[in-house]
Amino acid sequence: MSSAFRTVWWEAGQVCLIDQRLLPNETRIVRCAAVEDVAYAIRTMQIRGAPAIGCAAAYGMALAACSAAHDAVGDVARIYARLAEAKALLDAQRPTAVNLSWATRRVLERAQSLNDPSPHDVAQRVLEEAHAILAEDLAMCHAIGRHGVALIPPRGHVLTHCNAGGLATAGYGTALAPVRTAHEQGRPIHVYVDETRPFLQGARLTAWELIQERIPLTLITDNMAGYFMKRGDIDCVIVGADRIVANGDVANKIGTYSLAVLARAHRIPFYVAAPSSTIDCSLPNGDAIPIEERSSDEVTMLFGRRIAPEGVIAAHPAFDVTPADLVTAIITECGVIYPPFAGALQRSGPKRH
């Protein structure tokens, strides 16, 4: 990821993040002073991408802990209660992305592991854990790049969907990590970027990131993918994930399932890149994944202007589920996992309680 920007960070007791709704035309920093501000940023997609919102939520827990420690005056039970409230608030904002609840659970459990702490001790431990989650995510993304680069053929043409780059993570990205690694190694590579309606994460964010890195790209509308596959222009598809369940089913941005079907029809490898924090083996298959439904206005409006007739109600599931049998391999920081996925995912995923 270019050193010119960070996705989310802690500064002077606040959570800072780039407002991704405004890119690429404006780079605005949002400063969150309370956990409610972080929840709002996640819900309104000022910050998005499963790993990134996990990092932001961890820092949101730190804001809640610091505020409660200031008010608690020795009452540790009060700070734990405030952390539980903060976790419930944050978890409710984007239910499909499991990194969110994983991060808040990890922070809360770490705080509860302290022996006879003061409120200050709890707040300090929560902030340290949030810093650790951010650093670990960045390291995992680099590892995904190292493992995944071997899957891209020489002079490879890669199709990606939505944004699974540095803006979706602590930095460097998941689906874009192998692409970045190939580019850093001096290997010629070209990326086909789905614009990704209705929020245009591909056109606005992925294209912007690739331009920062001077990686060649072609922007296409979502309904052009089959055309370029049939022409032989695509060597492989690499996407990110918001949740990978026990059998290998993958929840990701709406439209991912369609790409997987097209890739199978054209015998093109379909890879999913995600850190282990995205693996959720508590769910047996994709039918159990909660799918977030977002506002109809995000489909019928574009940049504040209506693009559909007044009164039209649009469906807007934010994610779909790609069955495991359409996935060629899953790239994690631990290595490349091939079917059958179940056993390897159990070993690779984080422990959840």
Swiss-Prot record:
Residues given in the record as substrate binding sites: R48, G49, A50, R94, Q201, N252, K253
A Gene Ontology BP annotation from the UniProt entry: L-methionine salvage from methylthioadenosine
Gene Ontology MF term list: S-methyl-5-thioribose-1-phosphate isomerase activity
Entry keyword annotation includes Isomerase: yes
InterPro entries: IF-2B-related (IPR000649), IF-M1Pi (IPR005251), IF_2B-like_C (IPR042529), Initiation_fac_2B_a/b/d (IPR011559), M1Pi_N (IPR027363), NagB/RpiA_transferase-like (IPR037171)
Major enzyme class: isomerase
Enzyme Commission number(s) from the entry: 5.3.1.23
Active site: D242 (proton donor)
Catalyzed reactions: 5-(methylsulfanyl)-alpha-D-ribose 1-phosphate = 5-(methylsulfanyl)-D-ribulose 1-phosphate
Keywords per UniProt: Amino-acid biosynthesis, Isomerase, Methionine biosynthesis
Pfam families: IF-2B
Marked site (Transition state stabilizer) residue numbers: C162
Pathway membership: Amino-acid biosynthesis; L-methionine biosynthesis via salvage pathway; L-methionine from S-methyl-5-thio-alpha-D-ribose 1-phosphate: step 1/6
Family: Belongs to the eIF-2B alpha/beta/delta subunits family. MtnA subfamily.
NCBIfam families: eIF-2B_rel (TIGR00524), PRK05720.1 (NF004326), salvage_mtnA (TIGR00512)
Function: Catalyzes the interconversion of methylthioribose-1-phosphate (MTR-1-P) into methylthioribulose-1-phosphate (MTRu-1-P).
HAMAP family: Salvage_MtnA
Protein name: Methylthioribose-1-phosphate isomerase
GN (gene name): mtnA
